[in-house]
Structures are given as C-alpha cells and as structure tokens.
C-alpha cells in the first residue's frame, strides 16, 4: 500500500535472507491493493496490472525457489501472473466469501481450470507440502494432517481421507 518498487525489492530481499537462514517461509503473497469504501484510502487508485506483474517477477527472481509466490485468483487474471512466476493461487472456497475482498467472488474451480488450460490445479493443506513431509507442524494437528495429506504432502483426493496410506 504505497510502497515504491525499491521498497518491495528491499522487503523481498529481507524475506529471502530470513528464509535462507531459517528455512521457514512457506509463501509470499503478492496482493494488489483494492480500496474499500469507508476507509481512509477509499479514494486511492488500485495499482496498474503492470505493477502487479512486475512485483510477481521480482518475487520470483529474488525469493528462493522453495518459497511459493502466491496471488489471489479472484483479483487479477492468474494465468498471466503464473507466466511471471506465481506458483500458488491460495485458498478458493465454494463455501465462504473472500473476507478480505468480499466484492470479488472466488472463482469456480472448474472454471478456473478451464482458464488455466494445461496448468494443473492441485489442492494443498494450509501447511505446504515440504513442511508436511518434514513434520513441521504441531503434534496437536498431526493426526489430522496425516489423515488429509498424501505421500507428497498435498491434500488427498476427497473421499480418500480415511484410506490407509502404507507409505506414511
């Protein structure tokens, strides 16, 4: 919100350095500003699409490869951003609104897949697959994660959550 390109570069470089030291950053969300009525910034302009594209490119170039670059698929065409380095489309809910941007409906998963063409969608848990595989989660949710994740750390196909997974 009002950062310059240099500010974004500095922030991304700081995040990258922290991740290289600690290995704990799952994702960086690049989200365009959308002014909201009744707020102090209601009359501020949204950033140009080109600025979002540039921010995604910067993130993809600066961040380590194991840090996901995420955008919300309901705010801007995700296919064009995937071409610039987006690796994650975040959460899409058929049950709830986008609480941050309630004016922007979540896309229907089937419609989104059609838009993306040969780019596959793959459901994951809130804990990213590498962290699932490393066991980087609380013991309190361990059984749930083991029940819901496959051998790759992604979400099991719906309906198979209770199936035995011999490799776990």
For each feature predicted by the language model, list its residue ranges.
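Short, glycine-rich nucleotide/cofactor-binding loops
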Residues: 2-4
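Auxiliary Fe-S-binding modules of radical SAM enzymes
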Residues: 9-168
